[in-house]
Amino acid sequence: MILDAGFLISVDRGERTAQEFLTAALAHDTPLTTTHPVVAQVWRDGARQARLARFLQSVVVVAFDDGPEVGNLLARAGTSDVVDAHLVVVAVQRSEPILTGDIYDLESLTSALPERQPNVFNWP
């Protein structure tokens, strides 16, 4: 499962829904992944984000090294959100669904894909 910023914010705030999701993901051996650009969106002060820092140690954080693929997807979709486009590219590469609070933005990107479209689920 590829995690967008909304979920990481929920973790950072200690929201019960995030904890329940994490418990279920662990019980079902669901791999959790996010990206460095998503982390950059939510990271503000490590001293005040201990919960988020601990969480990030337990997930795969994918580097942003897919610039041409992301740019091509943005061109096809006619949009400009690099972070969202990178999430979609990573989801396709890993064959994993996306969990996001911006379902419509991501669906506009996934619909621009020439082939495999990852599933996109709304959070919360």
Regions found by a protein language model. Give the residues of each.
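Phosphate- and divalent-cation-binding pockets in alpha/beta enzyme and binding domains
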Residues: Q41, R51, E69, S108-L109
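Acidic catalytic patch
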Residues: S58-G78, V89
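Short active-site oxyanion
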Residues: H28-L32, S58-V59, V92-P97
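Alpha-helix capping/helix-boundary segments
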Residues: F7-L8, V38-V39, D66, H86-L87, ...
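Short, well-structured N-terminal submotif of metal-dependent ribonuclease cores
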Residues: M1-T34, W43-F55, P124
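Acidic, PIN/NYN-like endoribonuclease modules and their adjacent C-terminal/linker elements
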Residues: V92-P124
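Acidic, metal-associated active-site segment
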Residues: V42, D81-P97, D105
